[in-house]
Amino acid sequence: MALFGGSSSQAPASATDNKVQAFKQQIAQEIAVANATDLVNKVSENCFEKCLQSPYKDGNEGCVDQCLAKYMRSWNVISKTYINRIQDASTTGEI
């Protein structure tokens, strides 16, 4: 019971903040997994559709390797930019 007979149902601010941060981290991890899954699906669709032809040719493997490398370079640039924007927004209090 709190002062004057009322009940105190509020959690301490630090405990609430910890829960919020944990929830944000969980969401960020789920988004990262979803993005990685999306990347794998797009790479599979685009690179293999573009490069693997019937009948199989010796150049097909090199085409797939180059396509995968391009996707990964692009993914890295986009991810770094996204992370920087999120960090900037976090420090300015936008999120």
UniProtKB/Swiss-Prot annotation:
Q: Which InterPro entries does its entry note? A: Tim10-like (IPR004217), Tim10-like_dom_sf (IPR035427)
Membrane topology designation: Peripheral membrane protein
Motif annotated as Twin CX3C motif, chain positions: 47-67
SUPFAM superfamilies documented for this protein = Tim10-like
A Gene Ontology molecular function term for this protein is:
metal ion binding
> Single GO cellular component annotation?
mitochondrial inner membrane
Written domain comment of the UniProt record: The twin CX3C motif contains 4 conserved Cys residues that form 2 disulfide bonds in the mitochondrial intermembrane space. However, during the transit of TIM13 from cytoplasm into mitochondrion, the Cys residues probably coordinate zinc, thereby preventing folding and allowing its transfer across mitochondrial outer membrane.
The protein here is known as: Mitochondrial import inner membrane translocase subunit TIM13
Organism, by scientific name, is: Candida glabrata (strain ATCC 2001 / BCRC 20586 / JCM 3761 / NBRC 0622 / NRRL Y-65 / CBS 138) (Yeast)
- Underlying gene: TIM13
